[in-house]
Amino acid sequence: MFKVFGFGAKEEIPELSQEEKTKAILKQAHDFEQALRAMDYVLDDNADEGLALLDESDAKEASDQTINALARGVIEFLEATLGFEAEEMKKASATLAKAEALSLKSRERAQKIGLKSSSLYPPGTVYAVTYTESCLLHALLMIFSESMMEAAKAILKLRKSYYMLQEILETIKAANKAKKLKITSGSEDKESTPATFITGGDAFNSVDIPYELTPEEQKDKDLLQFAEQIHSMRTKRLSGAHIGNSPAINRLRGELGLQAMEDLPEEEITDHKVLSDDIDLSQATIDEFVHSGVNLCFGILQVVISLLPPAIGAVLSVVGFRGSREEGLRLVWKATKQRNVHGCIGLLALMFYYDGPFQFTDDDFDIPAAVKDSSNSEDSEDEEMDGPTLLHPGKILEDALLQSRALFPNSALWLLNEARMLSGKGRLEEAVALMDSIDVSKIRMRQVKSLMIFDRAITLIHLHQYDRAAEDILSLLDISDWSHAFYTYFAGCCYLENWRMCEMGLMKSDKKDEYQKKAEELIFTSVNLLGKKTFKSKNLPLDRFILRKVEQFKAKKEELGVENPLDGIATSPVHEISYFYNGYNRMSEEHLELTKKMLTEYRNPAIEALDSDQELIKDLLVSLTLRRLGHIQEGCDILDEKVLPKFFSIQNGKVKYIKKTEDPWAYPTALYERALFTWKLEGMDGLPESKEWLLRAQGYADDYELSTRVGMKIKAAIDRVDHSL
């Protein structure tokens, strides 16, 4: 009955009657709903069921191969980017390339037959969106490739995506404007009137068919049954009852944490209620896909471009890329309001931005954003989030996450993000308790399992629970192929700190000798694993970091002539790892005091040698600890007197850098942190000086280990200062 598209056929495309077009439009909406359901299964930690659903759809006659290929590509993209494993990335790239090609063919076909499946946009628009989405995701995977040729191709793909997204976004704006004019004038367009079926005296409106039906179609029972089926699929998806769970409203909480989960009412709601007033129940599936897809892709693209270092950003601007972080964030936030995979990916991106391990919005740099007057902007009614809210979304982000937790109760991915949010709020013990509430061995997605264990280990070192952190991190050797060298080094650093705490009498344990032995073995053998079990054959930034550190430790041992290799290690390296993962912003006062004690009171031959470079690392970390403890001026004085003079000075009004390579990450980081000290001491009056420090941090070096991580943080801070000046 619904054999309309004839995918794979080489014959000329015939003209379709309205009845044939109506059937094709409903089939398209059905297949998109099926694909959205399949992707939601993955987000509920059931990738097998999602892929089986796509296999079932592919086997059916005249199914929409384009959306199925994209859905499969999105699933594989999520798996690949969660784990950064070469085979997974290669597999996802091939699928996304197929989706790109199919999208172009489907768009051309829809344009030729005039298949208007949207009341707002011209035929083929939805396939322009599937093309840009598959192109963008494919380009991101290509950027991770070590091939220069692939990286160059990725830039071209990004450029194509960028321009097509701009084109579609303009089409959306024009369509919305036209729609508002019609509403204002009171005119009615038959082409945009939902189809009405009339059978047995009852009427049913199908929002998926954007025009009036013929009298024969209105009474067609098969068409009606199909339209009702699609309506039912959408209703269940919007309520979260489409992937084997009861409606999500039953699990919706108002607060984070385990206690709030225990306080949920026991009585079950069976009605298909939506979680938010933002969800438009009258929106057609295809229109929803277009809106959310464009907002997500264009938003993420702009945020990524805005975070790139100036040198790369300048090159991209020449070929037409320009990124506005504020506009990008606003678009991603719009995408999250849609109850589909685009909204979920958008939320994951926002969680990484606001509460991820690097936290581009540094808690200590809490500058209030300027409120810009947008009253004269023709799009002002669409700007639902102002500058201050975009900067500090607070409860809005929390509620969005809690909705996803309700929608996907079986997913460890969303539980992990709740734990990250708790950690970001300094509720470290609660974060660990939440991660402990799930049996890690039962997490189906291996990449999510790895992330859960890694994040728990990071949180445990912020709590100085090094024994368990080491056990967690070593367990990843059997689960993850990311960086066995870093896992081994990390665990060794944990055992080193435990041994030192035993030495200082801060910890009583009969395992002191075991800690010493494990620390020595793991730290110094970690470098033997470099280049092995990484998602690229060349070493990762953190791999290069540990190689340099271990070589430093070995050189100091030889220089001092000490027998115990651990006596050649000055500043405890676990505190560097804690800084890289934002630990100083998350520790309680109790744990900050313990960190300060470990940094300043432990003694060994390497520390007593007062090596200038090791003292710099120690003094930098102590200054940050003091700032978080509220001793801001004292911390700033340490930075000014003991850290900055070793590589930075101002002579005759000009900045002079002393280029050092001993600890490349520390020098621009110290300049960045100096900007935060100025802000904390002088407030808004100190913003011009803060910006000067940030520009100095940015200008210290173009490329160094961890430069991407540090550079993005600096760039985000500069944009924040600029927004408030």
From Swiss-Prot:
Its biological purpose: May be involved in mitochondrial DNA stability.
Alphabetized UniProt keyword annotations: Cytoplasm, Nucleus, Phosphoprotein
Similarity-based family: Belongs to the IML2 family.
Protein name: IML2-like protein SCY_3392
An example Gene Ontology CC term for this record: cytosol
Subcellular location: Cytoplasm; Nucleus
Entry-annotated residues carrying Phosphothreonine: T196
Modified residues (Phosphoserine): S246, S377, S380
InterPro entries (alphabetical): Iml2/TPR_39, TPR-like_helical_dom_sf
Source organism superkingdom: Eukaryota
Pfam families referenced in this protein's UniProt entry, alphabetically: Iml2-TPR_39
Presence of the UniProt keyword Cytoplasm in the record: yes
